[in-house]
């Protein structure tokens, strides 16, 4: 090679090195995202999750007032990645037609959400584990636009603790004798090693199914009926004997275990029987099995050690959270989620990383309200892309991490004068207990909730509006367990202000979600709930018509949900936006079913280059045999019992 050529190569190498160095100044992100983990019933206690505290909480911070807004997996995961409430994504259920993989794609969510926004900022993105329930054996060839390397779990294997996973559209693999959380841990660690080797900033999400129930889909050979069966979570073999002395925390501040008097609760809750001793004993064991299944704690340790050995730990944000909360034995319930009560809405959120002051404490060091819709704006801001926040139609705002700034948090990280002190939650559909078969399902569990929290006084209020238009109001400072519905006894000013907030937040979009006071008080005189309680505003709030439902529906229909602010916030025809509920005709259902069957028959694996690092567990993996895969496709069709579900 001539001297000139050598010089040219050297120059190119120098430019590449400088570019690489500049690129790596951006922080990395590792998100560990569990399934159905509560923040109320002590699941994150250091006795049960010591690594969570050692490796994330003590060198970072826990947000004590962190909530989901739709407490069920797939809509909540969509809120997280899109930064929008479910009434703005119109992704409102786990399965079609109101949720599911096809609706996720049909709404265009996979065309514009957090992983793709980060890729546009020069990031590699990685994903392994639970994705959407309806991402299944019938459609796995359609690779989620979620990452450089994407390894989502595939239904009906998603909630099998002997898991199957696929990689970038290839046939799902079985991992004989391997435990789900261990497989996801090993593959997540391998992805991190691959990400570091690639030399670009990265976002890696690791989503174990724990501590979700173990779920099987089976066909009764005698009747031909296919249905799902829920069982308590299955711990890893070494963990079966752990925490045998653990009991449900009935003596906690909430004190709502097996609530005797539910006369002030909605009619459908009053219809639930009080748990008898045999069911209480069973629920105690469910609780212990949930604790024993928290293998993600070991995952945390492996992730931190991998980042440390790679020399990137100090430039990496590590986040731990869950898709929704969970209750065992609260009120009259058995085990599950989907209600508007605290057990289901509150989830853990812990973070460490550059710019965040170490708490070095067992006590939460940040009590600013945070929501899943705030997650995407937070990541963008930490990644140096806060300039994008106004371009993505986000309902959320960055989390209050500025309260824990060690002086090196990005200078453009938003620091609002007034942090969010109120939010809304919502759910559409029925209620059923996951594990107590004696509790009858209830069809009318569609609801909205508005919740406030004043960081200085610790005062919190909650108003729940059921689709039957029954109301519940709780003073959360005096009654954190939501035992005493004071709707008829509360001061009129408190009730009217909460009704006013709900009327705005139930239909909010964009800025009105984080700052409803701008709608209620356009002159800017009121910026929080405490100020709104001033008697001089009584006439304003007494004139506001309460939010109501016309009837109970299992889906979002703007004509069914009435607020006097709907036109002001959403325009004259809100159904024309993303929130449109599109009914399918019989002809379109048949066409969709035909197309889906054709797609499900495709067996050719997508071409894909090997990862830089392969998890050792891959040595044991084998593809799911085609005859079993075909049978499972038919089983999944039969389970859904409506062909357009798989559209």
From Swiss-Prot:
InterPro entries: Alkaline_phosphatase_core_sf, Arylsulfatase, Sulfatase_CS, Sulfatase_N. Residues 1-21 form the signal peptide. The active site is at residue 73. It holds the Pfam family Sulfatase. Binds 1 Ca(2+) ion per subunit. The modification 3-oxoalanine (Cys) is found at residue 73. This is Arylsulfatase. It comes from Chlamydomonas reinhardtii. The gene is AS.
